[in-house]
């Protein structure tokens, strides 16, 4: 199965559509079955490059009113023409498609439950794998076109076995400033910063100062809610503590945002409530849980959270372009632009929704080169003992999360952590089976999710590939 989160950037019309009258090779202009008709209708909609036409097809034939992945593939590929049919019956077909703008092929599988049905039970489109240089070339082409349209400013690095396969950056720190974003430009990390919190806690575990299965009340002795104080460090690290969100990141949470400067301020806003569910009973992603972990770091170490991370992670890993600047000191950080995840058409700066500074839940800054240094240092034992690094990056009670790291097992085994907020997007993952790290830092909505998919889908074969 594909594991990175599907990109969710809402697209406008394609910049390079194939004309709707272009017919697929080896296919009749007069469909003879309902499946033929569905295929012709799909190809016409995709090749139109028109968002409304594509949505109408998916709504009618697949009960999917907002097929974001298909919209992105239509735009990234500039449309399709048939290369050849691999298989075709009255109820199913598999066809390989050429792409106008990108190297390689895409595979489309269509199926209906019964001959004559118009509703599809299977509609699966995905790029076919390419050699390293092909996957990287495709990713760069997608990034180039996004940047040309003002939809991507940021940096990408791909490394294998410690050697750099690709590195590039796009855009300016401020539009029109002439200050180009580079691989050393610090960029907002959003929730990717949770990895720093996890490593910090595990360092304190290694030092014998924190126990994973101890309740947070052992360290935060004056915590205001007795039930929340019983939640363990481990449950917060793997999002099974029921701690909930922090109430400062939404567009409508500006009043809370204005009040918050420190972790203690966040606890003042959120500390009175109990867990949202019995701790350990289920998994629910929680920003507030990592705020509590940050408070434990401060209490046990005697250092402010940002100072601890600087001394114990950034400095040892050689991360000279990383930190936790406040909102008044972001001149060197690229300005993010957002459409509030499709809530509006116009892009606006994300400054109104930025918290005062990054925290233990995320939001610090690092350059692409620094993130590469962090990923390169983690497995060496310099930041964590090997056994704790292994524990952090393997699935536990939560199949997709370790201790502060998003993980996956199987042939696409990986560890890392993405981050998404208004006007910022991060995708940073290490794929263990091919010893490859993909790093994308962006200053736009959901753009790095889209770019890691462009690379990932062309790097790993489909799980059901038979040749």
Model regions and ranges:
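Short, low-complexity N-terminal intrinsically disordered segments enriched in polar/charged residues
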Residues: 21-51, 127-137, 281
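Short solvent-exposed beta->alpha transition segments
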Residues: 37, 44, 48-94
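Exposed beta-sheet edge and beta->alpha loop/turn motif
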Residues: 89-136
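Structured C-terminal helix/loop/strand segments within mature extracytoplasmic catalytic/sensor domains
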Residues: 133, 421-467
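Short, conserved catalytic-motif segment at the N-terminal edge
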Residues: 133-189, 209-211
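Short, surface-exposed loop or secondary-structure junction motifs
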Residues: 174, 226-422, 426
